[in-house]
Regions:
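Structural signal for glycine-centered tight turns and loop->strand junctions in beta-sheet-rich domains
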Residues: 368-370
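Extracytoplasmic metal-acquisition and chelation regions
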Residues: 2-353, 358-361, 365-366
């Protein structure tokens, strides 16, 4: 065969082989692209909520307003795949109701699918979040809480303690049957352990409506967590501090004290400037003396200046309780805090004290502090 013909055939063979390789490679590339598009499509599935916002069925980013809500939420979502929970105000050591949103806070909320708050007007920035991020689903955990304390109720109790007791009792019962406006409610609802359980249930219920595939898991987690919380509530019920009269210098503590049956004189202070006016101090001291009030309660992180001033004038003892507003981010953080409070409240009833005509008299050290 002519050498030129052989050379030509060799060149044609090389060209044909190259073309085949190019075609085969292109098919593999297209196949990979199609497969990738399918996977991306599956990972970006969404579900519509009642308000029209879309939540990913694969990953849900939840942001909580502050620490107590964070602890509730991690318990409700425990073991649910694809759910990420973060706390917006993670560096906050006190109450959220005087909090101002930072740029970093807004960035966190911007990335959220769900924002969970206390409700009852505790978070003053709630409307701002709704306005800026209308597609973020907001869960009001306090939506169906039943044990609320109103400011009006406190005023009536403090002003009329020794007058018209039967009339006040009837009025308080009527107040409970009427709807209380947000501005009148003490919003620190989580400090009543029964309220806390209701908040946990509400979070689970609303998350189940958003993430239907995990609805049963959310409710199961809530039920298991609430069983542990019920044990704390039962311990408080058995403690029975009914009839004990006390002063609370931190309004969030009032929920826990009243849950335990205590008769509380609540003194509301400005969170930015906690100094009490001379008039308030004078009235409080007189009321404490008239009613033999021997217990003053403050938060574990609060300044004790006001408490010591009242204690020095009345001989009352100071007790520090944990408001569960910060902690170690553990699942049982709230339970540990409430058990600690239980031990302290037990001391109110037992520590070097005795009961006389329904009143409690306590001996205390030179610092007037437990």
């Amino acid at each position: 065969m002519d050498k030129n013909i052989i050379k030509l055939l060799t060149i044609l063979l090389i060209i044909i082989t190259t073309i085949c390789l190019i075609i085969f490679s292109g098919n593999k590339t297209n196949e990979s692209k199609i497969k990738g598009n399918i996977e991306n499509s599956e990972n970006s599935k969404t579900t519509n909520t009642d308000d029209g916002s879309k939540i990913s069925e694969k990953n849900i980013n939840i942001v909580t307003s502050f620490y107590p809500i964070y602890v509730m939420t991690i318990n409700v979502t425990n073991g649910v795949y694809g759910v990420n929970v973060s706390n917006m105000s993670e560096n906050l050591k006190g109450c959220i109701h005087d909090y101002t949103l930072s740029t970093d806070d807004l960035k966190k909320v911007e990335k959220a699918d769900v924002f969970i708050e206390t409700g009852e007007n505790l978070e003053p920035f709630s409307n701002k979040i709704k306005s800026i991020y209308p597609n973020v689903k907001i869960i009001d955990s306090g939506k169906n809480v039943s044990n609320l304390i109103s400011e009006e109720e406190n005023e009536n109790k403090n002003e009329n303690k020794n007058e018209n007791k039967n009339e006040n009792k009837d009025k308080n019962e009527n107040d409970k049957s009427e709807e209380t406006s947000e501005s009148e409610v003490n919003p620190h609802i989580w400090m009543n352990t029964k309220n806390y359980c209701e908040q946990v249930t509400e979070i689970a219920k609303q998350l189940g409506e958003i993430d239907i595939n995990n609805k049963e898991k959310y409710m199961e987690n809530a039920e298991n967590y609430n069983k542990k919380l019920d044990e704390i509530s039962n311990k408080f019920s058995e403690l029975n501090l009914s009839g004990v009269r006390a002063v609370s210098l931190d309004e969030q503590l009032e929920y826990l004290l009243r849950q335990n049956g205590m008769d509380v004189i609540s003194i509301e202070t400005d969170h930015e400037n906690s100094a009490l006016s001379a008039d308030v101090v004078s009235k409080t001291i007189n009321e404490m003396k008239e009613n033999n009030v021997k217990a003053i309660f403050i938060d574990k992180d609060s300044d004790d200046k006001n408490a010591k001033m009242l204690a020095n004038e009345t001989g009352a003892r100071i007790y520090r309780l944990n408001s569960a507003m910060n902690g170690d981010n553990s699942y049982d953080s709230y339970i540990k805090d409430m058990n600690q409070n239980y031990e302290i409240l037990k001391q109110v009833k037992e520590y070097n004290g005795r009961w006389v005509d329904g009143q409690m008299w306590i001996t205390f050290n030179e610092n007037n502090e437990f």
